[in-house]
Amino acid sequence: EEEIGCTSGWVPFDGRCYGFFPQELSWRRAESFCQRLGARTHLVSIHNEEEHQAIISMLASSQPYSDSEEQEANGDVWIGLRLSLRRLWEWSDGTKLDYGSWYRDVLPRRRACAALEDTADFASWDVELCSDRKPFICAYRT
């Protein structure tokens, strides 16, 4: 029954639908792109290990990453987490930050955005320049 409500090509998991977009955009443009897809659609927020694993599986089967030779070409993938002006990490969909999988314990000193780290097979998050262009994941609740 989870399938109901997901747009064709999107992956259902635990009441949400996930879509991977290979086009490379800055964090802000990626978030705007997601929002244009639907009222409740944003860059993905991740709240537990199971959700994170589901996203990793989706990326593993997504076109740009299915061929290991191509992996370096695309690199990291944007998620909806960024350092706000108040110096707090916040999800773009407004949900609570209640889970983390940071690549290293570096707290950035300036505005920054989080991406899934490709060298860690997307199992960890790293801090990136928000202006960097990367593929991204959008999500919405069903």
From Swiss-Prot:
InterPro entries reported for this sequence: C-type_lectin-like (IPR001304), C-type_lectin-like/link_sf (IPR016186), C-type_lectin/snaclec_domain (IPR050111), CTDL_fold (IPR016187)
Annotated Gene3D superfamilies: Mannose-Binding Protein A, subunit A
Post-translational modification: A minor form with some unmodified Ser-68 and partial phosphorylation of Ser-66 may also occur.
Subcellular location: Secreted, Extracellular space, Extracellular matrix
PROSITE patterns with a match to the protein in the record: C_TYPE_LECTIN_2 (PS50041)
UniProt xrefs under SUPFAM superfamilies: C-type lectin-like
Disulfide bonds, paired cysteine numbers: C6-C17, C34-C138, C113-C130
Coiled coil: none
Segments passing through the bilayer: none
Modified residue annotations for Phosphoserine: S62, S68
Pfam (any one): Lectin_C
GO MF term list: carbohydrate binding
Domain of life where this protein originates: Eukaryota
Keywords: Disulfide bond, Extracellular matrix, Lectin, Phosphoprotein, Secreted
The C-type lectin domain, residue ranges: 13-139
One cellular component term from this protein's GO annotations in UniProt: extracellular region
Name of this protein: Dromaiocalcin-2
Organism: Dromaius novaehollandiae
Classification of source organism: Eukaryota, Metazoa, Chordata, Craniata, Vertebrata
